[in-house]
């Protein structure tokens, strides 16, 4: 009569299972090497996406500043302007409620926490009738971050386009 092995498996099956627990050192090293290679390939792509995101957020901030300042001029009934500083990469919103000198509205606002570059100082003036003029610089300016440039164009009536 045949007796069953105490584990319920015959000796050959038991030996195969006993020797096949876990991963070998070669298998682990191959997985680590492949993970390292994939990570090394993806890091430049991720950095490029982060740079693009940072530039796009600065451009969106500038666009928002222009559009909201135009809205304030239309709503309040007196001139407003947005002054972009190329030296400090920030902007200042100003208004002219009465008198001949523009007054700051709030503090200077940095365009981004990263070192952005403006093409030139630009001040865009918004009249209560909806007209827009550039009193310093032009109504076309660029913002650059790590070699990538976006051009912002403001039409005579406040339409903002980005290229």
Residue ranges and their predicted role:
Residues 21-33:
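N-terminal signal-anchor/signal peptide hydrophobic helix marking the start
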Residues 1-16, 37, 41-75, 79-163:
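N-terminal helix-rich module
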